[in-house]
A protein has these predicted regions:
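A short, hydrophobic C-terminal helix/tail in secreted or cell-surface proteins
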Residues: 180-184
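Aromatic-enriched alpha-helical interface/lid elements that frame and gate functional surfaces
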Residues: 136-179
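Rossmann-like NAD(P)-binding element
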Residues: 1-5
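Active-site-adjacent "lid/gating" segments in soluble enzymes
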Residues: 6-153
Length: 184
């Protein structure tokens, strides 16, 4: 939790006086500043407040936690990247630095184009199951043998799907399906 190491006399400002080359990393639920900085941070809270739970799950369903501790995992990866960048900077400058990562920030970053779309349009994103907003078809589909995943991530793959799997080359040039959005 932010502030604990300072109370123990082991905060970054104290340690950098002893060793100016120190790289000091901290991971918390909500960062060192702001209204929630003293609150405990758990993965499920980071997933909820970072927006991930609002876009995970079935369309029209309840907010759903990702199947793994994604906030914890991404927080660890982000702090690792920060430490490596700080080591590289120290090689150049000779100085250490503080690396601060919050689980919530990591989850916001993981929402990628969904967060950007909200900022751009003001529309609140909703869960869409296995679909992906920028690519279509990209989903699980029921077929005679059970379920199949189709992910035509670009036009070349879409054309291959139409020609070789669906045997429907007419769908490639049909105005209804010329770009990913109408294919939904």
């Amino acid at each position: 939790r932010p502030g604990v190491m300072d109370k123990l006399g082991l905060g970054y400002d104290v340690l950098k006086e002893i060793n100016p080359r120190i790289i000091y990393a901290a991971v918390s639920g909500f960062g060192c500043y702001g209204p929630y900085h003293l609150r405990p941070g758990y993965d499920i809270l980071a997933q909820a407040m970072g927006g991930m739970m609002s876009i995970t799950g079935s369309k029209g369903g309840e907010p759903t936690r990702a199947g793994s501790a994604l906030g914890d995992i991404l927080g660890g990866l982000h702090v690792t990247i920060g430490i490596l960048a700080a080591v590289n900077a120290r090689t150049i400058t000779g100085k250490g630095q503080r690396v601060d990562v919050s689980l919530m920030d990591s989850m916001i970053a993981a929402t990628e184009n969904t967060a950007l779309k909200y900022i751009e349009t003001g529309n609140i994103p909703a869960p869409m199951g296995n679909r992906y907003a920028a690519v279509s078809p990209y989903d699980s589909f029921t077929c005679k043998g059970g379920k199949v995943i189709i992910a035509a991530g670009n036009q070349k793959l879409y054309e291959k799907l139409c020609n070789e799997v669906l045997e429907r080359p007419d769908m490639i040039t049909c105005l209804l399906y010329t770009s990913p959005s109408p294919r939904d």
